């Protein structure tokens, strides 16, 4: 028999729930109520984060089951709660103005309360999922990224990174009747009897799929909508199939190999883990141009006469403009003409472009007439 069930009710589990069941419940609810996915879910997201933080720690859960939990006020904890005898969890300052949220277990008796400071819900999310939520907006401007994709155009490393903004306004008022956290209540590391080593983040399984894009779309930028089918765990615990449209904003100048990652958009597993989906950009072959970094290369075919006496040709650039290419001098096979600023946009500065390089390919005749042989010998 537990003293209080608010935290269990918040995670929609029974008080007898196992560690795996708690984690599964948190994952499901965190994805559902994360403010970047559900603009109205901020309060609920904070509540389930606190619930999971307490119940996933065996020592805290034991105390919660015995005594329940109450939000502290702005005053410092009573004597004995800050590292003295009987404090139990080391010194945790009270939630002063703008400070971290402080809670205590209702143990009764002078100096008997056991205090701890609630962590930033974003940190809890990262510890469980192994990354920040990939999306924009939400939680006081705390989450960066665009539609689930990495905003770094080189895209060699991590994905869906976030920057920390101010703390989340509001609080756990529905559960505990307390006021909101101060504007700087961003990050607090709980400690029970001294510093607790941080746990390595769980690594989600990543499902990789190709994203084929034409050279023209990579030149202008585009939006691709990808329909995916995934398996999710419904309220009854059964795995059901669900379709979803993922929107990918391809930026001008992106290169083959660019990775776009969507956190938590893959299959939900019975153990509570959720797969990530990662798209890897691939360039479709182009009939005229080949790409070399930010440069575009193409070939112009010349007859032997044009190679010897000069030529004038009109070509089309990748964006459809007409460009005159000419020479009045003999042209060697493989000779290259470079036109700066007619290549691909630079990913980090799309207003600038690479080069267009034109290679002259001389077409030699397969046979010569007697007159041509005589002319060639005279030449």
Swiss-Prot record:
Biased amino acid composition, Gly residues: 81-95
Keyword Signal: no
Protein known as: Protein psi1
Its biological purpose: Required for nuclear migration during mitosis. It is required for the normal initiation of translation.
GO BP term, pick one: cytoplasm protein quality control
Protein origin, superkingdom: Eukaryota
Region spans: Disordered: 69-95, 176-205
Listed Pfam families: DnaJ (PF00226), DnaJ_C (PF01556)
GO cellular component, one term: protein aggregate center
Ranges that cross the membrane: none
An MF annotation (GO) of this entry: Hsp70 protein binding
Record domain J: where: 1-70
UniProt KW keywords: Chaperone
Keyword NAD on entry: no
């Amino acid at each position: 028999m537990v003293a209080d069930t608010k935290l269990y009710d918040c995670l929609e589990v029974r008080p007898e729930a196992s560690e795996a069941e708690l984690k599964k419940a948190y994952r499901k609810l965190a994805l559902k109520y994360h403010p970047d996915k559900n603009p109205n879910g901020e309060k609920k997201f904070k509540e389930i984060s606190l619930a999971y933080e307490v119940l996933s720690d065996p020592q805290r859960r034991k105390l919660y089951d015995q005594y329940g939990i109450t939000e502290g006020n702005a005053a410092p904890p009573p004597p004995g709660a800050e590292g003295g005898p009987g404090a139990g969890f080391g010194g945790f300052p009270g939630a002063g103005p703008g400070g971290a949220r402080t809670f205590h277990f209702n143990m009764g008796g002078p100096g008997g309360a056991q205090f701890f400071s609630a962590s930033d819900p974003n940190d809890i999310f990262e510890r469980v999922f192994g990354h920040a939520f990939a999306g924009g907006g939400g939680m006081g401007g705390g989450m960066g990224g665009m539609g689930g994709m990495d905003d770094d155009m080189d895209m060699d490393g991590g994905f869906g990174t976030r920057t920390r903004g101010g703390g989340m306004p509001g609080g756990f008022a529905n559960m505990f009747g307390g006021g909101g956290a101060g504007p700087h209540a961003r990050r607090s590391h709980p400690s029970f009897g001294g510093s607790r080593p941080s746990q390595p983040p769980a690594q989600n399984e990543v499902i990789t799929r190709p994203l084929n894009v034409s050279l023209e779309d990579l030149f202008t930028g585009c939006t691709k909508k990808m329909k995916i089918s995934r398996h999710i765990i419904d309220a009854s615990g059964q795995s059901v199939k669900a379709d979803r449209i993922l929107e990918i904003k391809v930026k001008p100048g992106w290169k083959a190999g660019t990775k776009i990652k969507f956190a938590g958009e893959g299959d939900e597993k019975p153990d509570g883990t959720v797969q990530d989906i990662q798209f890897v950009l691939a360039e479709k072959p182009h009939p005229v141009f080949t790409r070399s970094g930010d440069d575009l290369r193409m070939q112009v075919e010349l007859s032997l006469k044009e190679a010897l006496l000069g030529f004038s040709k009109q070509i089309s650039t990748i964006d459809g403009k007409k460009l005159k290419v000419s020479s009045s001098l003999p042209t060697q096979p493989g000779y290259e003409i470079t036109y700066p600023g007619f290549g691909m946009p630079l990913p980090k500065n799309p207003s600038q472009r690479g080069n267009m390089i034109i290679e002259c390919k001389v077409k030699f005749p397969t046979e010569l007439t007697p007159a041509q042989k005589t002319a060639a010998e005279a030449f």
